[in-house]
């Protein structure tokens, strides 16, 4: 994309589920033999939307459905990528892998996994010292998270321990 520029008559090539070419006018490259061509004249193609704060219900009673209505709804409205900043790690990363491998239909799923929550809640990791923070972040990163949500930590020292551990481990922190 180039800012707000609209290509009125263009061509798009998708190879192995990845956009490999976008151009104006008729196709300027040669398609591989046996490639599927779809005429979308009069239609609009746009990049997928990203929901950066989505709670898609991946933790409902510990049950992970094979068909998740919220995933279908997201896709129907053009949301192709989601980020859940607080959810059960085991289920969300399992579902993310199922979507990635084609065993489940849904948007790309990114998540912080289990929240580092300073108050009582369903899902939390208690941080009382730097080693607690390191342990929680190592576990979260091992699930597949690239970030962790630190929320409602009662003391400044706890927030600093989370940030220090994150820097050491190479994971980002989504603060409250």
Give a label for each model feature:
Residues 40, 44-45, 49-57, 66-175:
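Divalent-metal coordination cores built from histidine and acidic residues
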Residues 25-26, 51, 63:
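A generic structural motif
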Residues 4-46:
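Histidine-rich, glycine-flanked metal-binding segment
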Residues 59-61:
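N-terminal processing/targeting junctions
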Residues 21-23, 173-176:
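Short, hydrophobic beta-strand segments that form beta-sheet elements in well-ordered domains
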């Amino acid at each position: 994309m180039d800012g707000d520029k609209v290509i009125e008559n263009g061509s798009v090539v998708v190879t192995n589920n990845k956009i490999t070419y976008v151009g104006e006018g008729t196709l300027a490259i040669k398609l591989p033999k046996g490639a599927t061509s779809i005429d979308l004249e009069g239609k609009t193609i746009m990049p997928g939307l990203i929901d950066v704060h989505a709670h898609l219900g991946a933790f409902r009673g510990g049950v992970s459905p094979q068909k998740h209505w919220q995933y279908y709804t997201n896709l129907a409205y053009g949301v192709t990528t989601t980020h859940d900043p607080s959810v059960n790690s085991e289920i969300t990363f399992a579902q993310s892998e199922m979507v990635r491998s084609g065993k489940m239909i849904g948007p790309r799923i990114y998540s912080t996994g289990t929240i580092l929550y300073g108050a009582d809640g369903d899902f939390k990791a208690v941080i009382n010292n730097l080693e607690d923070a390191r342990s929680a972040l190592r576990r979260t990163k091992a699930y597949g998270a690239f970030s962790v949500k630190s929320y409602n930590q009662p003391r400044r020292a706890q927030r600093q321990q989370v940030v220090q551990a994150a820097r050491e481990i190479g994971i980002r922190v989504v603060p409250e």
